[in-house]
Amino acid sequence: MENRDLKMAEKIAACVADKGGRTFLVGGYVRDLLMGKHSKDIDIEIHGVQPKELENILDGLGSRTEMGASFGVYGLRGYDIDIAMPRQEEATGRGHKDFKIYVDPFLGTYKAAMRRDFTINAMMQDVLTGEIIDHFGGQEDLKKGVLRHVNPHTFAEDPLRVLRAAQFAARFSFSIAPETIELSQTMDLTTLAHERVMSELEKALLKAAHPSIFFEQMHKMNQLDDWFLHLTQLIGVKQPEKYHPEGDVWNHTMQVLDSAALL
């Protein structure tokens, strides 16, 4: 976290504590911290104060921006921090916007973390004390290099999480838990918006040392056909063994992809 943003997060946390609440770093920041990586994902979650109280705190610290006030997400102008309140989501349709959102300042850390996609992204860190809150074994999965979904019901509500599993597997060279692969095989990706798919693909191609893992995991989850049919069609296409000891055109393409990532 940038020092300036960290100091602001601490100021927010101190004001929240004065009102009887707690402030946690959540999501990618905590994961990256434990992996020894620098993170630009600066997300904090405010527990134990009402939305109006939080708004008053933010107004006293700077120029508040409403990134989604109706579902408890704010910002401060000039700072790269996302400020959210605990919330629950209920799917009302198949699209990524088809959700009812319920803000609940007193939801508790367990239920708040349950809406996260993977255990490694469900950890929290108290901004003031540094305490790590890990309800779902994220630290252990991080040590083992495993991507495991937190909750099968919330995971299945957003099919983008299948692509996120493949993307994280490629970026971190992690494996995907068998139960997560099995769940992902049942999910329908055809409803996803093109730009959401391309965003995950871009991360895999530009941030992973071995982007082939993204496509290999998508194939393992039986999810290549809907978005990457042209790659599926390469599987089993033979090449002259004399010139291509790596095997079929699929293997050749994956090797070329990984070589390109080194450039």
Walk through the language-model features, giving the residues of each:
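Catalytic cores of the polymerase beta-like nucleotidyltransferase superfamily
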Residues: 1-263
